Amino acid sequence: MSGPQDILIGEDKLTEKCGVFGTFGASKEAARLAYYGLWALQHRGQESSGIASADTKNIYDHSDFGLVAHVYKDEDLSALHGHVSIGHNRYSTSGGRDACYNQPLINKDRTLAFAHNGNLPETHKLEKFLKKHKVEIGALNDSGMMAAAIEVYMQDGLTIEDAIEKSYPLFQGVFSALAMGKDRLVAFRDKFGIRPLSIAELDGGYVVSSETCAYDTIGAKF
């Protein structure tokens, strides 16, 4: 995307929310689909952009500060292998301008990638849970705490789906989120459905997005 609207970071109508996009089974180059999806969602966040992908063996990722068109080179996308991917355009609501807050977040074992749009104004229960499980929360924003809670249950042997179900009551706020493992993608949002998230079909697979405008870019059927 080009034009002056891309750099109006102070405009509320352009920077009030992040954008998330994910794809599963719609292409062997899922990261490229995520790139086009994030391009269409550029208006939802201009601070940073990131994509994570997986090929059943590994999780790969690339993120940086800036607009989608500037963050990814062709070689970056070529290095993001696999048939599943998630992407994120960030407008910060918590945390600061630090690379550690760029999303998708990847855990140390590289078994979980997490992208989140929303805000958790009440994190007392979540913080208490993480402290109980010896998770250092000092540098974590709400997105990081959500990912950490899911990882706690995954370390107990639960699948990503079950780990999300177990940790879901701890997430007090409004959000839409994507969690990706090496062979799966899970999309979920707050119980009131306040933050937008939809699903569409493409070439026998699925794509999910914060806004349906991203589907037009890649030809997905909503």
List PLM regions with ranges.
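Conserved short alpha-helical segments that host acidic/polar catalytic motifs at enzyme active sites
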Residues: M1-F222
